[in-house]
C-alpha cells in the first residue's frame, strides 16, 4: 500500500472508477493487494481484495514509509496526503462536480471527526439539494432502513426512559469505516489527516476492502455533493457514500437516464441476498400470502385497542405541527422541525406494535431483527413466483422440519422486505408502461409519496384485521333470540349482494413520506351523488337542471365522516389514508349499526385535513424530518403504487450455505451440478452476482454495443438423454439478484450454467442438505438409493418384522398383516391380473432374500413357515425357484416334464389325489396361523430366527428386498413414490489410460477396448482429456454398426446384449502444438449395475501404427488404392485414410472375397474404428503366389539405392519415428463420417477351411479430387517414370524376383513410435522372398511402384494420401498389408504361359489386331491427324506381353513395327472421335468390364461416369490408349458410315461434385439461356404488336366499308318507302271520300224513311205504356 500512496497519476475512468488488467495475476483474494509497480497503466487495477482483519491491523495510515519508497524510485514526495490510485468517483449526471476539496480546506474553525453523535443522525435536513439524484435518495433511504431494522427496537425502549446510559447498538454505519484503528468489535474510526480510509462492504460474494481518500466533491454553489449530517464536520456519511458509489458505478444502467441499476445498498451494507419479485396482477394473492408469512402481523388485543384509543385522544390534543406517538394524520398539517424532539416518539410508534404482538400465537421477530423471521405456522400453499413468473412461497414448516439433517438447532430464516417503484420517464417507449406509471403516480400522491422521487420503502408489518377493534354490539335480551324475524325490504328491484372485502394492509416506512407534498382527498366512490340525467329524460332535454352543489358537498362531507369509521378500522388512527375511506365503505357496507360511534372523532380528523388542504404551497415547510415515517396501505393500492418488492434473506439463518466465485475474462460458461435429496419439499435460495465489466473491459461509450447481462440458468439434468431439461431458474442481472427454487419431494439433479464476461459469484442457501460442484463431486451421490427408496423399503421391512413378532398373537396378527399389505401394496389396482402379479413379485423377492441371508443350513420347515406367513402355495415350485424375476412373471403354470398322453381316468385320479394332499397341506398352513398350536409355535420360532438375522442389518436387507422387486419391472411398482427417483439413479465406472508425448499434426489411437454387455441398458460414455481433438467411436461387433453421435459426441444409447460386445475406440489429433504426456479417462454412466465390463483384465495403451503413403494417380475406376490384409491370428484393427485435399470425398471399404463388410465415407479423411480380421486357412508362409501379397522388394541395385535414401531420410524424421507434417487442414478428425456395414457371418465351427481374403479399398467419390495443372504435370511425370521402370525391368525379365515395390510402411509400435530398422527388415524380406521364389516355378511379374512419399517430401501442392492401420503392439508382426495386384498378376501369368508355349504369339496378335483395325477405319490426311507416338498408342497389354514374352531384340523389333503400323493407321482417329460420342460406348464399357472379371460394379459406374464427363466437356479428341485396349470384335464397320452424334443427349445422369467451376459454368450457361430467351421473347412480342396493329387497321377498314354499304342501303330503302307512302296516302284519301259519300246517302235515306212513317202509331204506343 505504501507504493499506492505515493502514486500521483490522475486516473481517468470510462464510466467506472476501476480498471483491471486481464492477466490472471490481478486476481489475488484473501490478502491485502499491494501494487508495487511504478509503471502501472492508467485504468488498470486489481479487483478489490477480500476483507482481512490482519491486513487492517497492519495497515499504514500515513505517508511514513511510502515517502521513502518514492525517494528510491526517483520521485520526490511532494504531496503529503493520500490520493486514491483508482481515481475520483463518478457522480450521476444530475450532480455537476465543480471542484474537489479536502475537509481541512473547508473546516477552519473545527477539527473534522468521523463520528459526532452515536445515537441519532439526520441525513435529510442538510441534503435537500441532493434529493434530485436517484442514487442519493437510495443511499439515504437504505441507510435509514438498515438503522431501523437493527436499532429501531433498542432505541424505542431507550427513548421511553428519561435517563440511562446510551444503548449498545448492534449496527452502526460508521463501523464499516476504518482509520487509525484496529479491526476489533466496536471500533471507532478516527480522523486521518493523511486522508486514507478503508471501508468494508459486501460485493461479489464476500466482504471487500475498499480504499478511499477524503476528497469531497462540490458544485458551483459550494454545496457538498455527498450526503452529510447536520454536523458539517462529521465525515462518516461522505466516506461511506464514496465507497458505496464505487460499487454502484460498476452496475450497468439499463435505462439511459436511470442513475441506479440493480445495485442495492442493503446488500452492500449487510451481505443479505436480495430476491426481486415483480408485482404482476395475476399473482397478487400469492404475493399477499408470501408477505403475510414473512412480515410481522398486527393483531388486535385488549391492551392494543386501549392504547390506540388513548393515542387517538392524545393526537387530537396535540398541535398540528407536532407529531406524537400516533400522530400521523395531524402531521400533514405542519411537519416538525426539531429532529431530536420527534425522533424518540417516532421510533416508539414504529416498533411498539411488534412488541405487543409477541403475545399472539404466531411468533414475531425480536426488536433487533424485526421483520426478518418467517412464521413457523405459515400457509402450506405451494406455488412458484419469481422474476420470470414462478416464485415458490417459503414453506416454513417443511424447512424447519428438514433441519434434522443439520447439526444446528431449529431456526427460521430472517428476511427483510422493501418495495420500489420506477420513476416516470417520458422516454419510455411502451405505452402500457406509461399507463402503469401514471396509475402508480396517482396512487402514490394519495399516500404522500412522489413518483418523481423514486426510492425504496421499507415494508414493516402486515395486517388482516381492523386497526381499531369495532365496539361490541349491546347484548340482546334472550326473548329476542327466539324466532328472529328477517328484515324485509320493500322494493321491486333485486338486491345486490355486497361482498365484504378482506382486510389486507401493509405498513411501509419511508423518510420521504409527505416530502414537498400537499395532502388531499380523492373520493373514489360516489354513492350519494345523484346523476343530473333523470330517468325518462333524454340527455339533450331543455329542462333546467337543479344545482346540487351544496347537497353534493354536504353528502361528500357526510360520506367522508361516515367512511372514516371504516378508515379507522382500516388504517391506524395516527396516520392518514387519503381518499381510501370510500373504498372501505363499499367493502364493509353502510348497514353497520355501530358505525357512528367514532363519527365525531373522524369529523375532527377530516376538518384538520380540510384545513391542511386550504393552506397554500408557500406555507409548506421546506424541510422534512430525518426519521422514517410509517403509513398503512391497502394491499391493492400497494400493488398499483409499487412495481417490485425486494426480499433480503440473511444467509446465516440458513442451515447450509455454498459460495463460489470465479473471475476471468472469458466468454465461457461455467457449469455446476447440484444434488439434493429430501423427504420434504425442497427450497433453495440461489443468489447470483455478475461482474460484466471492469475498467477498460466493457467500458461504455456512445458507439459501443450494449453489454449483455450476466446469466444464470438452472435446469433439470439427466445423463440418459440429450434433450434439455425443463428450466427451473433463469436470472439476468448486471449486479446481484436472488430467487427461491422450489422442488418437490425426492431426489433431483440440477445443472447450473453461469455466464458473465468478467466474473461471477453464486451463493446457494437451504435448510436441507445438498451437494454442489463439479461432476466428479456430485456423481457419487446418485449411486446409493434415494431417501424415498430407503424409507419405502424400511416401511415394508418393519411391517414384515411386525408380522413375525405378532405371529403368535391372535389379536394383533390380522392388523399386522393389513399393515404389511398397505406397506407393499399402497395403491389398490382394479386390474386383478396386475394385483396377482404384484403379490407374486413381493412373495418371491421376500423368499429369495430370506433364503440368501441364511448363514447356516435353513431349518427343515423353513419353506413351510414362509408359506404359512404369506399363504402362497404356487410360489415355491422347484421349476420356478431359479428363474429370473423378469422371466418368472410370464410363467403362470408348470409345464409337464414329458409329452406322454394320459387317459382320462389317469388324469382324474391324479387330480383327485393332488386335491386331497393340497387340502391337507392348506389345512396345516391355516392351523399354523392359529396361535397356541404346535404348528404355530414351530413356524413362529423359525420366522424369529430368520428375523434375527435380518434385524442385524435391517436397512441393507430392506433396500435389497425392494431392489429385487424393482428388477422384476412389474408395472405395479410404478405407483410407489420412490419410483420417480429411479430416473436419477445411476452407476458409473472409470477406465484410465496414459498416452505419451505427441508431436504436432499427428493422429493416434488413445483407447481401444471391447466391452461385454450383460443386460440391455441405457449407457452414455464421457471422455475426460486435455487433448484438443478427441473423438470416441463405438462399434457393435455383431452388426459392425456405429453408435450414433451428435456433434462428434456419442449419444445415450440402448446397448443390447450381443455375442461379441462393443468396441470403444478413441482417436486423437494433436493440432498445431506439441501434446505432453497425460492421462485419458473414459467414464461409463449407466442406469444400474452391473455395467459393461472389459473383455480382458486391464485396458491396453500400447499400439502399433503402420503408415502407407503414396501419391494419387487418377484412373477410370476412381480407386485410390487397394491393399490386401493377411493375419496369422484373429485380431482387431483400426483403419484410417487421410488425403492431402481436405474437401475430397472418399469412401473406405473392407472387402471380404469382394463383398463389402464395412464402409465409411468422409471428407478429407475416413476411418473404420474397428474391424476384426479373422485368420486365413493356411499360414502366410505356405500360401501360393497367387494368394499371397507380400511386401514388394526391388532388385539388388534398387534395394541399395532405397536403403541409402532411407538412411538420409531417417535423419529428418522426428525422434518418435512419426512424420511431422506442417499441413494443418488435412485429416482433421472432426469431419463427419458415414459408416455403413453388411451383417457379418457368424463364426461357425462347421466351416473351418474357409479362406478369408480381405481387401482394403479406398475410392474417390463424385470426382471430388480434381487435380490442378501442376499436379497433373507431376502425375504425368510419375507415369513416365513408371513406364521407364517397366521398360528397364523388361530388359532383365529373366531374373526371378518377387512381386511389387516397397511402399512406405512406417510402423509405429505403441505410443513410443519406435521404427524398426529398415536394413534389417529388408534383409528378412529378401531372405523370405528368395525362399518363396525357389519354391515357385514361375515368378509373377514385378510391377514397380513410384518412390514413396517421405516426410520431407510432403508437399500440400502434391496429391498424396496416407493409410494408417493400428494394431496392438504385441500383434503387429502378425499383421501383413500388401498392395493388391492379384488380378494383374493372373493376366500376366496367363500371357507368360502363352508366350512360353508359343514364342512370338504376342507380336502376332498385335499385328493381326492392327491389321484388322486398318481394314475398315476411315483414313484421313496426316494434317488432320498427326502421328501418334508409341507410348500413346501401344496398349498396356501389348507392352506387358512384349516385355515378358520375348527377348530384348524381339521387343525392339516389335515396338518398331507397331509404331510404323500405327502411324499409317493414325488417320482413323476421326472415326474414333465419332464413336466416343455415341451411346454404344456404354455398352462397350459394360461388355469390356464383364469380360475382365475382376472389376466391381462401382468401378464400372465410375468409369462410365468419367468417360461421359470427358466426352461432354472436351468433345471429340484424339485416339487414346484406353480406347485401343477395347476388344476389336466390338468395333462395327457400320460406324464408319453412320453419324449418331445427333442422337446423343449431352446430359449426364450420374451425380457430379458441385464445384465452384461447375457452378460458375452452369450460371453462365443459364444466364446465356435467359438472355437468348429474352431476346427471342422481345422479337416475338414486337412481331405480335405489329400484327395486332395491322389487324386493328384491317378491322377499321372493314367497319368503314360496312358502314358505307349500310348507309347506301338505307338511302335506297328510304326512297322506296317514300314512294310507297305517297301511293298509300292517295289510296287512303280515295277510300275516305268514298266512305263519306256512302254515309251521306245513308243519312238521306234515313231521313226520308222517318218522314214516311205515320204519327198515330206513336201515340198508341204511349197510351199503352200508361195503362
UniProtKB/Swiss-Prot annotation:
Q: Which GO terms describe its biological process?
A: proteolysis; spermatid development
SUPFAM superfamilies, from UniProt?
Answer: Cysteine proteinases (SSF54001)
What the record says about family reads:
In the central section; belongs to the globin family. In the N-terminal section; belongs to the peptidase C2 family.
Locate the compositionally biased regions of type Basic and acidic residues.
353-384, 1325-1340, 1433-1450, 1499-1511
Read off the InterPro entries from this record.
Androglobin-like, Androglobin_II, Androglobin_IV, Androglobin_V, Globin/Proto, Papain-like_cys_pep_sf, Peptidase_C2_calpain_cat
Report the residue ranges that make up the Globin domain in this protein: 763-890, 936-968
Residue ranges constituting the IQ domain according to the UniProt record: 906-935
Q: Which domain of life is it from?
A: Eukaryota
The cross-references to PROSITE patterns, in alphabetical order and at most eight, read: CALPAIN_CAT, GLOBIN_CP_ADGB, IQ
What the entry says about domains is: The globin domain is circularly permuted. The globin domain, which normally consists of eight consecutive alpha-helices from A (N-terminal) to H (C-terminal), is circularly permutated and split into two parts. The part containing helices A and B is shifted C-terminally and is separated from the main globin sequence (helices C-H) by a potential calmodulin-binding IQ domain.
Q: Where is this region: Disordered?
A: 1-45, 347-387, 540-566, 1297-1355, 1420-1522, 1646-1667
Keyword Iron appears in the UniProt entry = yes
Query: What task does this protein carry out?
Result: Probable chimeric globin with a bis-histidyl six-coordinate heme-iron atom through which it could bind dioxygen, carbon monoxide and nitric oxide. Required for sperm flagellum formation and maturation of elongating spermatids, thus playing an essential role in male fertility.
Ranges of compositional bias, category Basic residues: 1-11
Q: Name one GO cellular component term.
A: sperm midpiece
Q: What is this protein called?
A: Androglobin
Going by the UniProt record, its keywords in alphabetical order are: Cell projection, Cilium, Coiled coil, Differentiation, Flagellum, Heme, Iron, Metal-binding, Spermatogenesis
From the record heading the sequence, give the disease linked to this protein.
Defects in ADGB may be the cause of asthenozoospermia, a condition in which the percentage of progressively motile sperm is abnormally low.
Q: Which residues form a coiled coil?
A: 1588-1629
Molecular-function annotations in GO:
calcium-dependent cysteine-type endopeptidase activity; heme binding; metal ion binding; oxygen binding
Amino acid at each position: 500500500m505504501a507504493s499506492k500512496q505515493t502514486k500521483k497519476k490522475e486516473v481517468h475512468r470510462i464510466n467506472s472508477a476501476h480498471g483491471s488488467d486481464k492477466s490472471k495475476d490481478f486476481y489475488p483474494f484473501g490478502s491485502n493487494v499491494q501494487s508495487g509497480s511504478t509503471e502501472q497503466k492508467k485504468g488498470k487495477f486489481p479487483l478489490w481484495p477480500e476483507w482481512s482483519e490482519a491486513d487492517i491491523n497492519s495497515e499504514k495510515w500515513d505517508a511514513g514509509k511510502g515517502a521513502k519508497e518514492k525517494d528510491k524510485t526517483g520521485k520526490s514526495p511532494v504531496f503529503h496526503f493520500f490520493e486514491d490510485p483508482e481515481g475520483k468517483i463518478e457522480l450521476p449526471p444530475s450532480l455537476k462536480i465543480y471542484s474537489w476539496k479536502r475537509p481541512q480546506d473547508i473546516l477552519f474553525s473545527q477539527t473534522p471527526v468521523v463520528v459526532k453523535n452515536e445515537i441519532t443522525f439526520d441525513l435529510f435536513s442538510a441534503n435537500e439539494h441532493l434529493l434530485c439524484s436517484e442514487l442519493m435518495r437510495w443511499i439515504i433511504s437504505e441507510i435509514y432502513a438498515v438503522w431501523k431494522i437493527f436499532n429501531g427496537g433498542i432505541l424505542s425502549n431507550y427513548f421511553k426512559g428519561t435517563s440511562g446510559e446510551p444503548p449498545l447498538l448492534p449496527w452502526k454505519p460508521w463501523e464499516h469505516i476504518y482509520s487509525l484503528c484496529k479491526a476489533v468489535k466496536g471500533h471507532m474510526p478516527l480522523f486521518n489527516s493523511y486522508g486514507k480510509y478503508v471501508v468494508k462492504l459486501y460485493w461479489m460474494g464476500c466482504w471487500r476492502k475498499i480504499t478511499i481518500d477524503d476528497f469531497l466533491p462540490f458544485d458551483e454553489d459550494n454545496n457538498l455533493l455527498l450526503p452529510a449530517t447536520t454536523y458539517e464536520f462529521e465525515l462518516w456519511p461522505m466516506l461511506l457514500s464514496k465507497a458505496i458509489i464505487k460499487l454502484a458505478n460498476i452496475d450497468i444502467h439499463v435505462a439511459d437516464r436511470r442513475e441506479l441499476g440493480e445495485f442495492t445498498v442493503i446488500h452492500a451494507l449487510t451481505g443479505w441476498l436480495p430476491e426481486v419479485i415483480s408485482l404482476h396482477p395475476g399473482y397478487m394473492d400469492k404475493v399477499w400470502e408470501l408477505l403475510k408469512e414473512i412480515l410481522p402481523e398486527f393483531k388486535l388485543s385488549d391492551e392494543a385497542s386501549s392504547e390506540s384509543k388513548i393515542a387517538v385522544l392524545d393526537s387530537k390534543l396535540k398541535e398540528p405541527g407536532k407529531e406524537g406517538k400516533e400522530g400521523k394524520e395531524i402531521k400533514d398539517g405542519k411537519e416538525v422541525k426539531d429532529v431530536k424532539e420527534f425522533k424518540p416518539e417516532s421510533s416508539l410508534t414504529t416498533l411498539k406494535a411488534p412488541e405487543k404482538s409477541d403475545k399472539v400465537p404466531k411468533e414475531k421477530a425480536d426488536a433487533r431483527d424485526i421483520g426478518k423471521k418467517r412464521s413457523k405456522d405459515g400457509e402450506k400453499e405451494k406455488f412458484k413466483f419469481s422474476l420470470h413468473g414462478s416464485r415458490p412461497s417459503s414453506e416454513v414448516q417443511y424447512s424447519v422440519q428438514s433441519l434434522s439433517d443439520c447439526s444446528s438447532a431449529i431456526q427460521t430464516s430472517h428476511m427483510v422486505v422493501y418495495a420500489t417503484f420506477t420513476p416516470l420517464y417520458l422516454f419510455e417507449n411502451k405505452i402500457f408502461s406509461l399507463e402503469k406509471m401514471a396509475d402508480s403516480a396517482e396512487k402514490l400522491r394519495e399516500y404522500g409519496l412522489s413518483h418523481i422521487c423514486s426510492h425504496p420503502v421499507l415494508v414493516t408489518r402486515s395486517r388482516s384485521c381492523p386497526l381499531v377493534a369495532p365496539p361490541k354490539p349491546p347484548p340482546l335480551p334472550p326473548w329476542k333470540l327466539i324466532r328472529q324475524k328477517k328484515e324485509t325490504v320493500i322494493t321491486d328491484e333485486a338486491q345486490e349482494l355486497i361482498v365484504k372485502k378482506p382486510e389486507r394492509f401493509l405498513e411501509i416506512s419511508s423518510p420521504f413520506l409527505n416530502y414537498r407534498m400537499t395532502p388531499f382527498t380523492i373520493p373514489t366512490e360516489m354513492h350519494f351523488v345523484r346523476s343530473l340525467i333523470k330517468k325518462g329524460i333524454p340527455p339533450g332535454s331543455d329542462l333546467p337542471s337543479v344545482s346540487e352543489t351544496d347537497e353534493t358537498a354536504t353528502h361528500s362531507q357526510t360520506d367522508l365522516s361516515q367512511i372514516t369509521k371504516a378508515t379507522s378500522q382500516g388504517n391506524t388512527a395516527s396516520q392518514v389514508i387519503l381518499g381510501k375511506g370510500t373504498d372501505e365503505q363499499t367493502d364493509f357496507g353502510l348497514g353497520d349499526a355501530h358505525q357512528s360511534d367514532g363519527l365525531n372523532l373522524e369529523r375532527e380528523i377530516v376538518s384538520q385535513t380540510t384545513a391542511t388542504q386550504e393552506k397554500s404551497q408557500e406555507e409548506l415547510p421546506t424541510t422534512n424530518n430525518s426519521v422514517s415515517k410509517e403509513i398503512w396501505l391497502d394491499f391493492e393500492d400497494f400493488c398499483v403504487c409499487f412495481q417490485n418488492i425486494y426480499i433480503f434473506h440473511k444467509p446465516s439463518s440458513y442451515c447450509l450455505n455454498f459460495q463460489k466465485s470465479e473471475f476471468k475474462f472469458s466468454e465461457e460458461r461455467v457449469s455446476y451440478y447440484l444434488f439434493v435429496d429430501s423427504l420434504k419439499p425442497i427450497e433453495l435460495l440461489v443468489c447470483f452476482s455478475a461482474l460484466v465489466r471492469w475498467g477498460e473491459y466493457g467500458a461504455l461509450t456512445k458507439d459501443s454495443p450494449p453489454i449483455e447481462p450476466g446469466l444464470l440458468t438452472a435446469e433439470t439434468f439427466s445423463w440418459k438423454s440429450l434433450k434439455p431439461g425443463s428450466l427451473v431458474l433463469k436470472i439476468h442481472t448486471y449486479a446481484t439478484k436472488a430467487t427461491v427454487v422450489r422442488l418437490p419431494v425426492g431426489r433431483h439433479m440440477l445443472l447450473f450454467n453461469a455466464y458473465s464476461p468478467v466474473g461471477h459469484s453464486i451463493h446457494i442457501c437451504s435448510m436441507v442438505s445438498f451437494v454442489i460442484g463439479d461432476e466428479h463431486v456430485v456423481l457419487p451421490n446418485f449411486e446409493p438409493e434415494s431417501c424415498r427408496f430407503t424409507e419405502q423399503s424400511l416401511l415394508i421391512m418393519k411391517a414384515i418384522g411386525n408380522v413375525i413378532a405378532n405371529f403368535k398373537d391372535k389379536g394383533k396378527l390380522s392388523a399386522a398383516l393389513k399393515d404389511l399389505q398397505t406397506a407393499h401394496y399402497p395403491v389398490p389396482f382394479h386390474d386383478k391380473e396386475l394385483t396377482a402379479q404384484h403379490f407374486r413379485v413381493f412373495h418371491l423377492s421376500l423368499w429369495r432374500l430370506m433364503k440368501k441371508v441364511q448363514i447356516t443350513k435353513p431349518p427343515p420347515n423353513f419353506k413351510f413357515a414362509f408359506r404359512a406367513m404369506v399363504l402362497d402355495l404356487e410360489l415355491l415350485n422347484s421349476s420356478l425357484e431359479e428363474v429370473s424375476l423378469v422371466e418368472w412373471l410370464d410363467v403362470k403354470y408348470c409345464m409337464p416334464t414329458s409329452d406322454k398322453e394320459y387317459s382320462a381316468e389317469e388324469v382324474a385320479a391324479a387330480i383327485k389325489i393332488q386335491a386331497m394332499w393340497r387340502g391337507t397341506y392348506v389345512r396345516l398352513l391355516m392351523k399354523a396361523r392359529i396361535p397356541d398350536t404346535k404348528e404355530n409355535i414351530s413356524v413362529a420360532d423359525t420366522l424369529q430366527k430368520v428375523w434375527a438375522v435380518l434385524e442385524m442389518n435391517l436397512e441393507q436387507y430392506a433396500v435389497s428386498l425392494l431392489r429385487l422387486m424393482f428388477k422384476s419391472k412389474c408395472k405395479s411398482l410404478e405407483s410407489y413414490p420412490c419410483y420417480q427417483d429411479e430416473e436419477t439413479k445411476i452407476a458409473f465406472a472409470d477406465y484410465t489410460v496414459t498416452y505419451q508425448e505427441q508431436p504436432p499434426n499427428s493422429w493416434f489411437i488413445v483407447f481401444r477396448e471391447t466391452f461385454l454387455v450383460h443386460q440391455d441398458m441405457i449407457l452414455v460414455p464421457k471422455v475426460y482429456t486435455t487433448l484438443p481433438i478427441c473423438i470416441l467411436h463405438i462399434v457393435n461387433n455383431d452388426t459392425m454398426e456405429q453408435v450414433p453421435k451428435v456433434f462428434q459426441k456419442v449419444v445415450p444409447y440402448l446397448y443390447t446384449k450381443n455375442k461379441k460386445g462393443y468396441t470403444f475406440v478413441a482417436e486423437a489429433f494433436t493440432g498445431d502444438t506439441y501434446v505432453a504426456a497425460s492421462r485419458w479417462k473414459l467414464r461409463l454412466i449407466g442406469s444400474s449395475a452391473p455395467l459393461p465390463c472389459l473383455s480382458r483384465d486391464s485396458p491396453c495403451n500400447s499400439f502399433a501404427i503402420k503408415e502407407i503413403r503414396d501419391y494419387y494417380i487418377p484412373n477410370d475406376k476412381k480407386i485410390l488404392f487397394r491393399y490386401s490384409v493377411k493375419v496369422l491370428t484373429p485380431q482387431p484393427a483400426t483403419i484410417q485414410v487421410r488425403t492431402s485435399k481436405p474437401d475430397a470425398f472418399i469412401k473406405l471399404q473392407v472387402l471380404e472375397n469382394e463383398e463389402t463388410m464395412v464402409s465409411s465415407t468422409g471428407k478429407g479423411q475416413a476411418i473404420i474404428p474397428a474391424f476384426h480380421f479373422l485368420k486365413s486357412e493356411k499360414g502366410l508362409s505356405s500360401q501360393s503366389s497367387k494368394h499371397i501379397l507380400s511386401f514388394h522388394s526391388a532388385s539388388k541395385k534398387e534395394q541399395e539405392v532405397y536403403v541409402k535414401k532411407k538412411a538420409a531420410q531417417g535423419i529428418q524424421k522426428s525422434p518418435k519415428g512419426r512424420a511431422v507434417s506442417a499441413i494443418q487442414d488435412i485429416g482433421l478428425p472432426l469431419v463427419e463420417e458415414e459408416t455403413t456395414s453388411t451383417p457379418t457371418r457368424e463364426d461357425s465351427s462347421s466351416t473351418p477351411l474357409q479362406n478369408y481374403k480381405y481387401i482394403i479399398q479406398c475410392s474417390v467419390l463424385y470426382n471430388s479430387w480434381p487435380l490442378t495443372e501442376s499436379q497433373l504435370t507431376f502425375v504425368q511425370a510419375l507415369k513416365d517414370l513408371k513406364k521407364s521402370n517397366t521398360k528397364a525391368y523388361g530388359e532383365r525379365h529373366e531374373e526371378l524376383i518377387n512381386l511389387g515395390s516397397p511402399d512406405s510402411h512406417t510402423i509405429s509400435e505403441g505410443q513410443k513410435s519406435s521404427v524398426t530398422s529398415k536394413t534389417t527388415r529388408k534383409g528378412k524380406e529378401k531372405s523370405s522372398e528368395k525362399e518363396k521364389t525357389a519354391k515357385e516355378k514361375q515368378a509373377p511379374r514385378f510391377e514397380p511402384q513410384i518412390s514413396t512419399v517421405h516426410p520431407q517430401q510432403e508437399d500440400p501442392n502434391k496429391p498424396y494420401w496416407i493409410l494408417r492401420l493400428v494394431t496392438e503392439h504385441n500383434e503387429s508382426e502378425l499383421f501383413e498389408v500388401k498392395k493388391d495386384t492379384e488380378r494383374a498378376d493372373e493376366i500376366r501369368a496367363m500371357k507368360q504361359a502363352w508366350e512360353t508355349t508359343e514364342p512370338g504369339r504376342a507380336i502376332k496378335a498385335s499385328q493381326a489386331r492392327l491389321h484388322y483395325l486398318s481394314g475398315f477405319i476411315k483414313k484421313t490426311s496426316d494434317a488432320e491427324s498427326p502421328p501418334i507416338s508409341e507410348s500413346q498408342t501401344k496398349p498396356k497389354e501389348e507392352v506387358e506381353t512384349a516385355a515378358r514374352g520375348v527377348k530384348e531384340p524381339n521387343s525392339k523389333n516389335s515396338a518398331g513395327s507397331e509404331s510404323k503400323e500405327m502411324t499409317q493407321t493414325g488417320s482413323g482417329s476421326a472415326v474414333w472421335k465419332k464413336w466416343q460420342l455415341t451411346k454404344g460406348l456404354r455398352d462397350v464399357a459394360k461388355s469390356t468390364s464383364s469380360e475382365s472379371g475382376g472389376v466391381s460394379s462401382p468401378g464400372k459406374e465410375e468409369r462410365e461416369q468419367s468417360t461421359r464427363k470427358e466426352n461432354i466437356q472436351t468433345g471429340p479428341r484424339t485416339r487414346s490408349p484406353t480406347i485401343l485396349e477395347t476388344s476389336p470384335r466390338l468395333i462395327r464397320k457400320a460406324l464408319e458410315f453412320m453419324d449418331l452424334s445427333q442422337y446423343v443427349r449431352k446430359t449426364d445422369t450420374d451425380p457430379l461434385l458441385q464445384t465452384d467451376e461447375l457452378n460458375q459454368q452452369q450460371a453462365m450457361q443459364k444466364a446465356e439461356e435467359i438472355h437468348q430467351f429474352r431476346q427471342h421473347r422481345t422479337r416475338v412480342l414486337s412481331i405480335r404488336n405489329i400484327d395486332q396493329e395491322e389487324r386493328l387497321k384491317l378491322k377499321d377498314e372493314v367497319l368503314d366499308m360496312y358502314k358505307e354499304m349500310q348507309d347506301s342501303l338505307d338511302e335506297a330503302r328510304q326512297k322506296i318507302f317514300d314512294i310507297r307512302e305517297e301511293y298509300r296516302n292517295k289510296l287512303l284519301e280515295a277510300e275516305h271520300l268514298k266512305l263519306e259519300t256512302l254515309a251521306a246517302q245513308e243519312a238521306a235515306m234515313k231521313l226520308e224513311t222517318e218522314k214516311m212513317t205515320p204519327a198515330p202509331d206513336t201515340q198508341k204506343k204511349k197510351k199503352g205504356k200508361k195503362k
